[in-house]
């Protein structure tokens, strides 16, 4: 039996090829230097019938207790994995979204868009750059990761520069309660943002008729302008 990466049969460097190997197909192609070799901790013979022929077990011996049927075997990588190549930001043929390439700065979680691992929005940006643990577009202002005022499902900038958490309602993406382009406290009815009951640019008690906020009777009028809370 010919063992991939071993000329002239199966030598000690190959780790031997047993019946469990099942032969090596033409797609094996040998083991490159980027594999780092395989030691005694390998669950399977070196370079035996694994996708890309890199010496990385599908399941590590410590976590799986050996490569048995419970590990799911050494299956090929599907299209959802984006394939397995030397430039992949994923462990070889393990289809795990953890970056290991230079662009990701070592083994760190990635801000992923679609199925491709990309660096975070900005250098030094932490886990806040990502929404939950799922790969979604970053909620960022300019190049820095900050909380966003989101409308619907799309991340948009806050109403105004320097606007604080008051610009957003809770942690849910809803339109901001704002006057003009600046985030100011609103005269809101219930929890819904309605036109502010205001005189000029300041929120004051209103003279309301029915459920509609109308301007006070006269300019500069105080609380006597309103009847109770209605």
Curated annotation (Swiss-Prot):
Q: Which domain of life is it from?
A: Eukaryota
Arranged from A to Z, the UniProt key words for this protein are:
Keratin, Repeat
Q: Does the keyword Acetylation apply?
A: no
Q: Where is this region: 14 X 4 AA repeats of C-C-X-P?
A: 42-215
What is its biological role? In the hair cortex, hair keratin intermediate filaments are embedded in an interfilamentous matrix, consisting of hair keratin-associated protein (KRTAP), which are essential for the formation of a rigid and resistant hair shaft through their extensive disulfide bond cross-linking with abundant cysteine residues of hair keratins. The matrix proteins include the high-sulfur and high-glycine-tyrosine keratins.
| Subunit description | Interacts with hair keratins.
Write out the ranges of the repeats annotated as sequence. Answer: 42-45, 48-51, 54-57, 88-91, 94-97, 116-119, 134-137, 144-147, 154-157, 172-175, 182-185, 192-195, 202-205, 212-215
What family does the entry list? Belongs to the KRTAP type 5 family.
Print the organism lineage.
Eukaryota, Metazoa, Chordata, Craniata, Vertebrata
Claim: rRNA-binding is one of the keywords in the record: no
This entry carries the following GO cellular component terms, namely: intermediate filament
Stated name of the protein: Keratin-associated protein 5-1
Q: Which organs or tissues contain this protein? A: Expressed during the active phases of the hair cycle in the medulla and the inner root sheath of the forming hair. Also expressed in the upper layers of the epidermis of skin.
């Amino acid at each position: 039996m010919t063992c991939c990466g071993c000329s002239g049969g199966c030598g000690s460097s190959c780790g031997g090829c047993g019946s469990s190997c099942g032969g090596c197909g033409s797609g094996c192609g040998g083991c490159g230097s980027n594999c780092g070799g395989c030691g005694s901790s390998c669950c399977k013979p070196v370079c035996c019938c694994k996708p890309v022929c890199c010496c990385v077990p599908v399941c590590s011996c410590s976590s799986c207790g050996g490569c048995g049927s419970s590990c799911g075997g050494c299956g090929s990588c599907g299209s959802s994995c984006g394939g397995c190549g030397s430039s992949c930001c994923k462990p070889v043929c393990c289809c795990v979204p953890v970056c290991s390439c230079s662009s990701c700065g070592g083994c760190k979680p990635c801000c992923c868009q679609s199925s491709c691992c990309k660096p975070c929005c900005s250098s030094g940006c932490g886990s806040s750059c990502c929404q939950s643990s799922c790969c979604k577009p970053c909620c960022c202002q300019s190049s820095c990761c900050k909380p966003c005022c989101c409308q619907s499902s799309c991340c948009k900038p806050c109403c105004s520069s320097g606007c604080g958490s008051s610009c957003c309602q809770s942690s849910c993406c809803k339109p901001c309660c704002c006057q003009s382009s600046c985030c100011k406290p609103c005269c809101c009815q219930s929890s819904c943002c309605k036109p502010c009951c205001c005189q000029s640019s300041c929120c004051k008690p209103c003279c309301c008729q029915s459920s509609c906020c109308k301007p006070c009777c006269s300019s500069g009028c105080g609380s006597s302008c309103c009847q109770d809370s209605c």
